Amino acid sequence: MTTKTTDETFTVDCPICKKAVIWSPQSPYRPFCSKRCQLIDLGEWAAEEKAIPCENADFAMDPENNEDWAKH
């Protein structure tokens, strides 16, 4: 959740632990609260626990069955 605080400063919830994070240069890991939460998130992406939804992702898995693969 994003909330507005004084002086045009925003607070967001850390995506991992849900702690409030002030959105400013003083929060170097934003939107995460810490390096630890940042690395947990990176690990989830690396382990393919997270992914961006895509309807046409299968072509990349088997280039031999996709004629367009050779053109790129």
Swiss-Prot record:
UniProt entry keywords in alphabetical sequence: Metal-binding, Zinc
A GO MF term: zinc ion binding
Positions of Zn(2+) binding: 14, 17, 33, 37
Cofactor dependency: Zn(2+)
SUPFAM superfamilies: Glucocorticoid receptor-like (DNA-binding domain)
Pfam families per UniProt: YacG
GO BP terms: regulation of DNA-templated transcription
Co-factor remark: Binds 1 zinc ion.
Database matches in InterPro entries: DNA_gyrase_inhibitor_YacG (IPR005584), Znf_NHR/GATA (IPR013088)
PANTHER family referenced in this protein's UniProt entry, alphabetically: DNA GYRASE INHIBITOR YACG
Subunit structure: Interacts with GyrB.
General function of this protein: Inhibits all the catalytic activities of DNA gyrase by preventing its interaction with DNA. Acts by binding directly to the C-terminal domain of GyrB, which probably disrupts DNA binding by the gyrase.
Family according to the record: Belongs to the DNA gyrase inhibitor YacG family.
UniProt name for this protein: DNA gyrase inhibitor YacG
Species this chain originates from: Mannheimia succiniciproducens (strain KCTC 0769BP / MBEL55E)
